[in-house]
Amino acid sequence: MMQDPISDMLTRIRNAQAVRKKEVVMPRSKLKMSIANVLKEEGYIVDYREEGDSTKPQLVITLKYHEGESVISEIRRVSSPALQVYKSKDELPKVKNGLGIAIISTSKGVMSDRQARRLGEGGEVLCYVS
């Protein structure tokens, strides 16, 4: 059984980009769909979609490349099931001096650090993307 599905998602993305795959497939969950939505809104992936039936739903992410290089240079898990990292709206980190994003799980849903600051929300820091 998978202990940390978010780490698994990030690792699958990292590994697929390392071998220049166009798409990556993984088990689907609402949280993974929300993270994929933030990655799409911020321009780190081309698109995502659901596949499969209700017994084995899959999430398919279409990766984005620019001049042969992956748009995502680093994607790293911050909070984990063993050590959850929470930040208030004033403590939200700036990733690579604003060139990257932090994906935050707030009471209003999963969003980027910029959007959380705009809404005055803090929450669990899921990962950093740059």
Swiss-Prot record:
Keywords: Ribonucleoprotein, Ribosomal protein, RNA-binding, rRNA-binding
Function: One of the primary rRNA binding proteins, it binds directly to 16S rRNA central domain where it helps coordinate assembly of the platform of the 30S subunit.
Biological process per Gene Ontology, one example term: translation
Lineage, highest ranks first: Bacteria, Pseudomonadati, Pseudomonadota, Gammaproteobacteria, Legionellales
Protein name (record): Small ribosomal subunit protein uS8
Recorded superkingdom: Bacteria
One GO CC annotation: ribosome
Alphabetical list of InterPro entries matching this protein: Ribosomal_uS8 (IPR000630), Ribosomal_uS8_CS (IPR047863), Ribosomal_uS8_sf (IPR035987)
Pfam families from the UniProt entry: Ribosomal_S8 (PF00410)
Subunit composition and interactions: Part of the 30S ribosomal subunit. Contacts proteins S5 and S12.
HAMAP family, A to Z: Ribosomal_uS8_B (MF_01302_B)
NCBIfam families reported in the protein's UniProt record: PRK00136.1 (NF001109)
